[in-house]
Amino acid sequence: MAYDGFVNYTISKELSPCIIGGKIDSIFEPNNNEIIIGIYNNSSKYALDIVTSSNNYRVCLTQNKKVNPTFAPNFCMVLRKHLLNTRITNLYTLSLERIMIIEFEGHSKSENIGKKKIIIELMGKHSNIILVDSCDVIIDALKHFNNDENSYRSIISGSKYTLPLSSKHDFINLQDEKIFYEDCLNYSKEYNTEKLTDILSNLYTGFSKTLISCLLEKIYIEDFLSENNTSQAMQWSFRP
């Protein structure tokens, strides 16, 4: 299954009971695409694995033991300074975007840090882990980008964090079946395609083509645009 916005949202809901309220007791960076955060919560220990590899990005709990470098990389040291001994107060996604946010509060070993957040962007080769303060000012990031490398935002220490640009619609806030169909119809005409897998994956956040194909197969409708098909897809997606 592709790691799309729906998967990211579901994983956040599964992780929350395990790690919200937990105390950060270790942070490691076994390689330049991965951070592992040790969490103690409800008399249990958890290892939160955050991977930003372009072809296998994910957030999950792990029991795998990784070999860590003798000397911790700079970003790992920054995370330890700001997050060790704090507690996780919240974990959530931004709608169905592939962005997960973890909030921390408390005292680190060196100072009263107040509130901090890590923003996990799971977007292929652009995947990143960004540490920000309570005002969303970037403290540090696993990967840095300046205006020369990225025309619309900088990921460097001291700059204000801004969300990645997205032209897609928010599927969660969609309420009207007629508007849903009209949006799909307009896209179909503009890009000359009637395949729902193409239309939904390019028009709305959260959908991968793999997920759409599974959905269509589950509700026994074919992969083409019609008002009946979009109505059934929307009703199934929002059912309790």
Enumerate the language-model features and the residues they cover:
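Short Lys/Arg-enriched alpha/beta "domain-start" segment
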Residues: 2-15, 66
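Phosphate/anion-contacting hairpin/loop surfaces
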Residues: 3, 43-240
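Intrinsically disordered, low-complexity boundary segments flanking structured domains
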Residues: 10-15, 36, 74-78
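Glycine-centered C-terminal helix-capping/turn motifs at helix ends
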Residues: 20-21, 85
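Residue-level recognition of beta-strand termini and adjacent short loop/turns
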Residues: 31-33, 95-96
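Amphipathic, interaction-prone secondary-structure segments
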Residues: 34-41
